[in-house]
Amino acid sequence: MKIINLTGAALDWAVGTAMKLPPPYWADGKCANFSTDWAQGGPIIERHHIEICHLDNGEWRAQLNANQWGFHCRHYGETPLIAAMRCYVASKMGDDIEIPEAL
């Protein structure tokens, strides 16, 4: 599945997988909601220096300048957390990943 299409449980699963967490993914004693809960997604944004910007069209853009060669990952979303988590997953796993059918 293309990262640009990930939302909800599928996006949260991808974030947990990118972080190499064992399923089920837990954060603060509850099931992880990285793409909707700032307490869970915010530390990822801070730790990986993901830049977030609101665009004139209402979307959010997140980008990650990852190395000295200028490689950057850029993704968009309806919210800052969705954009940032898509960017994080793509930086770790590429722009196209396999998602379990149950999600």
What are these regions (language model features)?
Residues M1-L103:
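Glycine-rich anion-binding surface patch
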